[in-house]
Amino acid sequence: MKTICFYFQIHQPFRLKRYRFFDIGNDHYYYDDFQNEEIIHRIAEQCYLPANRTILEMIKTSGGKFKVAFSISGVALEQMEIYTPEVIDSFKELAATGNVEFLSETYAHSLSSLGDPEEFKHQVKKQEDKIKTLFGVKPKVFRNTELIYSDDISAMVSEMGYKGMLTEGAKHILGWKSPNYMYSSCVAPKLSLLLKNDRFSEDLSNRFSDYSWNEYPLTADKYMSWIAATPDSEQIINLFMNYEVLGSLHPASTGIFEFFKALPRFAADKGISFSTPSEVFTLIKPVDSISVPYPISWVDEERDCSLSLIHISEPTRL
């Protein structure tokens, strides 16, 4: 049976206020509390709360067959606790269904995996503790900032005890291979990998409300027919995207919530199930290993970390 693995990323940075020359030595508080509060309230109303209600309804109306995974950065969770505790409560309600998996990542949605192994491990442990405190579970699956992955990173993640990791299905890495299979790390064979299906993910994240798209409007029936038409041997369709796709990037007026609500029914009609990453790692075996000597990510056309590495290495220009 073909299965869909939905994963949503959630991150909100602590935004910094304008800091003037004459503030140096006089003002030691750097955060823009007004902007932080305004933005997370707006995103909560547009996305987090209505999307969580939609996911909960989908789980209930499907008889528990709809499943999903979230990765919520620690700093985003901190802001929710401060400004929108009702969002935390709604995620706890989802957690109580047993149909939602919370993944681990770096606490600050940082690039520490690219340059500071000790800081990376520290942030991952801090994130584990945050998820355990809020939702009562210890994450078993890892997802790095912007899906950043390399052989070296996979070795660290495996060393920390994770059984699986999510990353980008980059074409220059896969070549002729399909992202719709499970793979493993070539340097840490016990670490299984789920790779993002770019086409199907971006049909939702980028193209859903694009009037110029030749497939507009996209219906749940049409979308599921595309997935059902993939080769029978390709058992996993990994749909990875930002949670703000629901309600913020695509406003409610586009029909995005109604589209999602219809997915379980049309999936069932075509014999397609939904699984969490942990379930997939338990049920399906890797077909091959992949080698990624240089970091990849889901950012930009190149699907690499070139822009991130520029930010790390480039000196500050005055």
Predicted regions and their residues:
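Active-site and substrate-binding clefts of carbohydrate-active enzymes
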Residues: 1-46, 181-191, 195-198, 210-213, ...
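Short, well-structured secondary-structure segments
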Residues: 3-8, 14-17, 21-116, 140-143, ...
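Short, solvent-exposed loop/turn segments at secondary-structure junctions
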Residues: 11-13, 74-78, 107-110, 147-150, ...
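Generic structural signal for well-ordered alpha-helices
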Residues: 52-56, 88-92, 121-131, 154, ...
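Alpha-helical scaffolding within the catalytic cores
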Residues: 53-54, 82-95, 174-186, 221-227
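Gly/Pro-rich turn-and-neighbor structural signature
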Residues: 118, 133, 137-138, 143-184, ...
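CE4/NodB-like, metal-dependent polysaccharide N-deacetylase domain
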Residues: 119-146, 226-240
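Short "domain-exit" segments at the C-terminal end of structured domains
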Residues: 314-318
